[in-house]
Amino acid sequence: MELFIVESPTKAKTIQKFLGKGFLVKATLGHVKDLPEKELGVDLRTLKAKYVYKRGKKKLVEQLKKLSRRSSIVYLGTDPDREGEAIAYFLKKDLEKVNKNIKRAVFYEITPEAIRESIRNAGDVNMNLVYAQFARRILDRLIGYLISPILWKEFKNYKLSAGRVQSPALRLIVEREREIQNFKVKKYYYVKALLRKGSEEFWAIYDYRYENPSDAKIIAKKLEKGYFSVYKVEKKKEKVSPPKPFITSDLQSEANAKFGFSSERTQKLAQELYEKGYITYPRTDSYRMNEKKAKEFMNYIEKKYGKEYVGRLRRFREKATAQGAHECIRPTSLREEIPEREELRLLYDLIFRRTIASLMKEMLLEREKVTVEAITPELKHPVYLVAKGLKIVFDGWSRVYPSEITEEKLPELYEGDLLDLVKTTLEERKTQPPPRYTEGTLIKTLEKLGIGRPSTYATIVKTLKERGYVEVKKKALVPTEIAFQVVEFLMERFPTLMDYKFTAQMEEKLDLVEEGKLNWKSVVYEFMEKIFGKELEMVR
């Protein structure tokens, strides 16, 4: 018998179907070991950590030991990231006491071919990934255990917490709210004319911003006595590239905008789709797509929509943080629909259509700019108004993945055409404050700043809500009063923790640990020194 160990029962069930007899697939139900719940669990001088079994996991490991003893080989098929590697590491340490033949099987999608290939190429646990997880876990523990109690004491509120990613994210939300509160709305005005050619009407706008409505009214009144004609017609073709395939941040952002899903809900659903074998691994920051799969998708496009819709597999400049072997989030097959509950079907359909759209031809647009000349005895010089039109010449990728681009139709206009004036009017506009963050826009902002990674995005807003820092109103994240107070306190007491640049640099250093280019302890020591400074001696 060969033993194959994964984290979740769903994943185990899917893989068991693929491997059949001769294999036994078992699940750990997540991490088996972690730092203790009721103590720091880390020696601050040596960084030696005290990892203990999570509740119920010692018994589970004993059961796995019995199975390992009876197995010819043990494969550790946990997720292909820092957390999955740490689970594999602790399992190996326990199981190699009874069976030395233990291999790490790495795969990025749950299909028969991918699982068999992971078995053929099974190797050892990647210690660089494990060290990066140690560093991440210890950093988070230090902040949780050393800073959170300071907040409890200061604000007499035991729900409060601080975090390496959580606190800078809260700062973003609070600073945006301050911008909104300090924003002064200003009204301004444009003069518009409703014009007619034959039986067709269209609007043209005088492109001058009036602060005073009475000034705009004077011009509008004078234009009522004017003669209007087409002065110039400019047409320009424009290509609109298809969207990129999904990475974690894009998927969470899009599902939030389209379905109102929280990032945590999207991640749970995506994980379930992955474990059932429908999509590739959902925690990724790489846009890369397997060439063989891309060809299959492009053949599908040709058969379903025609050759003119087939695009190409584009190469994207990968972020420095993108892991080489990871792919974008894509379907594992050409299955258009899945026999699952509605939430899963919705998310799968979104991923399927986005993947197909990313390999289709560009949209082709024609933009039209018509300059209208108005001559009136009331004014010394002509006034020029502008009308804009937009025509979709070829729908391309938007046939599969709806675009926000809409047609703006104008009559067929030629230079010299005489036009009738129907009426003039003022259009009142207001300066807009910056919008509040939604979960989706917050994640995209954090990603742009280099804060957080695909595995952490889903938990950020969940934690902020649980701690009473934010409320969700009409999808927007609204900070509570305590959020303002905590951000102000942390900015004064622990400014480095709240510094966006420093947080991003720490993320980069964790990535370098993952690549084997930095020692994990040196990263933790540097972080401790910069965050806690002299206070570190007090807690030591």
From Swiss-Prot:
Cofactor(s) recorded in Swiss-Prot or TrEMBL: Mg(2+)
**PROSITE patterns linked to this entry:** TOPO_IA_1 (PS00396), TOPO_IA_2 (PS52039), TOPRIM (PS50880)
* Subunit field text: Monomer.
Q: Name one GO biological process term.
A: DNA topological change
Q: Which reaction does it catalyse?
A: ATP-independent breakage of single-stranded DNA, followed by passage and rejoining
What family name appears in the similarity comment?
Belongs to the type IA topoisomerase family.
Q: Where is this region: Interaction with DNA?
A: 161-166
Alphabetized InterPro entries for the sequence: Topo_IA, Topo_IA_2, Topo_IA_AS, Topo_IA_cen, Topo_IA_cen_sub1, Topo_IA_cen_sub2, Topo_IA_cen_sub3, Topo_IA_core_domain
A GO MF label = DNA binding
Which segments constitute the Toprim domain? 1-110
The residues that the entry says bind Mg(2+) are E7, D79
Organism for this UniProt entry: Aquifex aeolicus (strain VF5)
Please state what the protein is called.
DNA topoisomerase 1
Under Enzyme Commission nomenclature, its number is: 5.6.2.1
Q: Where is this site: Interaction with DNA?
A: H31, R136, R137, D140, Y145, W152, R283, R467
